[in-house]
Amino acid sequence: MPTSIPEQELMEPGHTACQGCGATLAMRYVLKALGKKTVVSVPASCWAVIPGAMPNRTLDIPMVYTPFAATGASISGLREALDIRGDSDYNVVGFAGDGGTADIGLQSLSGAMERGHNVFYIMYDNEGYMNTGVQRSGSTPYGA
């Protein structure tokens, strides 16, 4: 079955991430796959600064910035609000690293999954808390 990557870019040049940052590539391809009708929620992380400041943001989609532990709760609320508004065709995405998912954010993600919300959750596992000095996370392999 032939597949293709859409040409539309929802992540423009000029972000502030470190060179070679895997999180930026992950976000770029997630947005290509999900399209313009996407709302992304990110916790306190590198993604709080990667898109840049308004009005020069590099992402062409709405983003919600949440406390570290609240990504799961925010995507639950976003999904419910969009459904109530009649915008059920929007994709709702939580996009967090391994620290914000496997450690600090696990309880709110668990709640969102248990309630069965129609959302996407992307954990980009870079095996540490990269924006605060590369401390290990709960998903960092033993001995790494």
Give residue spans per PLM region.
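Cofactor-binding active-site loop characterized by glycine-rich and histidine/acidic residues
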Residues: 1-121, 128-130, 134-143
